[in-house]
Curated annotation (Swiss-Prot):
<dbReference type="InterPro" id="IPR036921">
    <property type="entry name" value="PurM-like_N_sf"/>
</dbReference>
<dbReference type="GO" id="GO:0006189">
    <property type="term" value="P:'de novo' IMP biosynthetic process"/>
</dbReference>
<keyword id="KW-0547">Nucleotide-binding</keyword>
<dbReference type="Pfam" id="PF00586">
    <property type="entry name" value="AIRS"/>
</dbReference>
<dbReference type="GO" id="GO:0004637">
    <property type="term" value="F:phosphoribosylamine-glycine ligase activity"/>
</dbReference>
<keyword id="KW-0436">Ligase</keyword>
<comment type="pathway">
    <text>Purine metabolism; IMP biosynthesis via de novo pathway; 5-amino-1-(5-phospho-D-ribosyl)imidazole from N(2)-formyl-N(1)-(5-phospho-D-ribosyl)glycinamide: step 2/2.</text>
</comment>
<dbReference type="InterPro" id="IPR004733">
    <property type="entry name" value="PurM_cligase"/>
</dbReference>
<dbReference type="GO" id="GO:0005524">
    <property type="term" value="F:ATP binding"/>
</dbReference>
<protein>
    <recommendedName>
        <fullName>Phosphoribosylformylglycinamidine cyclo-ligase</fullName>
        <ecNumber>6.3.3.1</ecNumber>
    </recommendedName>
</protein>
<dbReference type="GO" id="GO:0005829">
    <property type="term" value="C:cytosol"/>
</dbReference>
<dbReference type="GO" id="GO:0004641">
    <property type="term" value="F:phosphoribosylformylglycinamidine cyclo-ligase activity"/>
</dbReference>
<keyword id="KW-0963">Cytoplasm</keyword>
<dbReference type="GO" id="GO:0046084">
    <property type="term" value="P:adenine biosynthetic process"/>
</dbReference>
<comment type="similarity">
    <text>Belongs to the AIR synthase family.</text>
</comment>
<keyword id="KW-0658">Purine biosynthesis</keyword>
<dbReference type="InterPro" id="IPR016188">
    <property type="entry name" value="PurM-like_N"/>
</dbReference>
Length: 368
């Protein structure tokens, strides 16, 4: 036996399944995408150990920082299974920045985490391009992130996403819910679709009912069902920020996991209760389809999905009509959906017979 045959195997990171060269190439490729999100306070250059942000250059005098992080849930699996990687990054940004704006904070910078078993640069670039698009829609800079190639952690072709965003609000201008009062009007801003919550139920229905996602939707023969389901989460930052700063909004609730019932109470002080009338807006064809396919009760709809409303505003009744008109002029679809009343902290959603396919008038309540 030769010395060469006796030589022990030489291990490397590449043999373990990690391609450092591919990771470096990805950083170089996505650099211009990050650069395109530059804004006052950040130049959005990638490659360092961290990203800098200059609050003074962003125009703040005595700011409070507000931080949030989130993911996209199993909507990512839809993107993977149907090669729809280009917009899932918008969802990632939306889930974070919409959570900041409800506290009165302007999103300033964003960092992403992309984890996979084997790095596919083509897919990763498409995902990051969507993240950059989301950052531009929100007015925040993509200043860094992490790409983790972890063999054995994910099935072939799978990946997961997480986002982290920091915003700022001048001291004393933050929204905490303490300005909400009895009699306040609740305005609802339309969602763009399912957004990023409830997809475990959506995917279960798709599997059990044998949906053909690459074919026209049963309720719309001009658009594929997958296009409805993968529609990115709406980003409300630019339309809401001017009215927050002018003091015209008392509270905001981002309608995510827990639906209308569980998210609105998060911004209410004790002793106040939100009443929402489901008759005040028309159920979308997509939501009606999901409900019918799953024989889902109205209460479960109100606790699982946004039901067509992605953001709820509490506003002074004297200003409600004017603010609704101004938001419509800013591009939002606005509904007057309810009121604030005295009562135990919580939310009640009501509907008449046939609303959300109910056989009789119904009411669903969450306390807490």
């Amino acid at each position: 036996m030769s010395d060469e045959q006796n030589k022990p195997e030489s291990y490397s990171y590449a043999k373990a399944g990690v391609n450092i060269a591919a990771g470096n190439a990805l950083v170089k490729a996505i650099g211009p995408l990050a650069k395109s999100t530059a804004r006052p306070g950040a130049d959005a250059e990638l490659g360092g150990f961290g990203g800098f942000f200059d609050l003074k250059a962003a125009g703040y005098n005595d700011p409070l920082l507000v931080a949030g992080n989130d993911g996209v849930g199993t909507k990512v699996k839809l993107a993977i299974d149907h090669d729809r990687h280009d917009q899932i990054g918008i969802d990632l940004v939306a889930m974070c920045v919409n959570d900041l704006i409800v506290q009165g904070a302007e999103p300033l910078f964003f960092l992403d985490y992309f984890a996979t078993g084997r790095l596919d640069n083509g897919v990763a670039e498409r995902v990051v391009a969507g993240i950059a698009d989301g950052c531009k829609l929100a007015g925040c800079a993509l200043i860094g992130g992490e790409t983790a190639e972890m063999p054995g952690m994910y099935a072939d072709g799978d990946y997961d996403l997480a986002g982290f965003c920091v915003g700022a609000v001048e001291r004393g201008e933050q929204l905490t819910g303490d300005r909400v009062a009895e009699g306040d009007v609740l305005l609802g801003l339309a969602s763009s679709g399912v957004h990023s919550n409830g997809y475990s139920l959506v995917r279960r229905l798709a599997a059990d009912k044998g949906w053909k996602l690459d074919r026209p939707a049963l309720f719309d023969n001009e658009r594929l069902l997958i296009d409805y389901l993968i529609e990115p989460t709406r980003i409300y930052v630019k339309s809401l920020l001017p009215f927050i700063r002018s003091g015209r909004i008392n509270a905001l609730a981002h309608i995510t996991g827990g639906g209308l019932l569980e998210n609105v109470p998060r911004v209410l002080p004790r002793g106040l209760h939100a009443r929402i009338d489901a008759d005040s807006w028309e159920q979308s064809r997509l939501m009606a389809f999901l409900q019918a396919q799953g024989n889902i009760e109205p209460e479960e709809m109100a606790r699982t999905f946004n039901c067509g409303i992605g953001m709820i505003l509490a506003v002074n009744p004297a200003q409600a009509d004017a603010l609704a008109a101004d938001l419509a002029a800013a591009g939002e679809t606005v509904y007057r959906v309810g009121t604030i009343v005295k009562g135990e902290k919580g939310c009640t959603v009501t509907g008449s017979a046939e609303t959300w396919s109910a056989r009789s008038a119904w009411e669903a309540t969450h306390i807490g």
